[in-house]
Amino acid sequence: MMKKPVVIGLAVVVLAAVVAGGYWWYQSRQDNGLTLYGNVDIRTVNLSFRVGGRVESLAVDEGDAIKAGQVLGELDHKPYEIALMQAKAGVSVAQAQYDLMLAGYRNEEIAQAAAAVKQAQAAYDYAQNFYNRQQGLWKSRTISANDLENARSSRDQAQATLKSAQDKLRQYRSGNREQDIAQAKASLEQAQAQLAQAELNLQDSTLIAPSDGTLLTRAVEPGTVLNEGGTVFTVSLTRPVWVRAYVDERNLDQAQPGRKVLLYTDGRPDKPYHGQIGFVSPTAEFTPKTVETPDLRTDLVYRLRIVVTDADDALRQGMPVTVQFGDEAGHE
């Protein structure tokens, strides 16, 4: 009779263990949450000179690690240095002309113009008097009609010269016209724009790395004459590291921007990387062939971009990654 309570006690213990184990399994499943499969994004960029010319030197080769701001290569600078000097001279000329237009005319120039008017007035008065006398002589048939016509022509020419001198004096006294000043200003601005372009062209004859990365290919060698935009290097961008994954509509609410996740690779199954969802595509697409999850292959899915916050050199582009959602990842 004593054995019966013992058996009952053992049964209770076993039942409690089963319940606890089931709860632990269920809780672990809840904590593990959503699992996705993706790949480290392959990000490459073709680097080129924005201007054309002869390649003077290349500072890196295939396989080299490069840093943002590093000089990678240079074209022959001489043509661009000459163009820059010409542009600077053009600005100087245009600036001087504009300054003259703003300053107006000097007192000496106005005095000279006034003297020219007096001289032209005297010449006109003489020509007019001479013409008047010739008219009287022609009426008395002392001179020919041709002589009278010559006197009229001289008078008209003197009158035109006087008007031109008067107009010039009037302009000198009133200063340059607004239209002339505006034209000089526009010429100066055009010369300044040409100078800025020449400076930019000289700057762009040096190829600078836009970001950190690894040089994949070197397409040309020193001495090559390139057209503008011709590819010189292909670079794999190493930072930031992005993981591309896909989620179906059922689990879309778990993949919100800012959500933290754990990232596992085959080489580090017990030491995950940490990431944060940076982008969720607003439109669905058919599942790409690269998606490994069988139950997603026929679904419409949404693309995720996950930014790896603690990436190192072991995380290579194209590498398969397991993305783990869960309370631990979400609250780290």
From Swiss-Prot:
Induction and repression of expression: Repressed by the transcriptional regulator CecR.
GO biological process: response to antibiotic
Compartment(s): Periplasm
Protein name, UniProt field: UPF0194 membrane protein YbhG
Consequence of gene loss (knockout): Mutant shows increased sensitivity to chloramphenicol.
Primary localisation category: periplasm
UniProt GO cellular component terms: periplasmic space; plasma membrane
Residues spanning the signal sequence: 1-20
Record carries keyword Coiled coil: yes
Membrane-spanning intervals of the chain: none
Matches recorded under PANTHER family: EFFLUX SYSTEM COMPONENT YKNX-RELATED, UPF0194 MEMBRANE PROTEIN YBHG
Keywords, comma-separated and alphabetical: Coiled coil, Periplasm, Signal
UniProt family annotation: Belongs to the UPF0194 family.
Coiled-coil residues: 145-207
Keyword Ribonucleoprotein: no
Role noted for this protein: Could be involved in the sensitivity control to chloramphenicol.
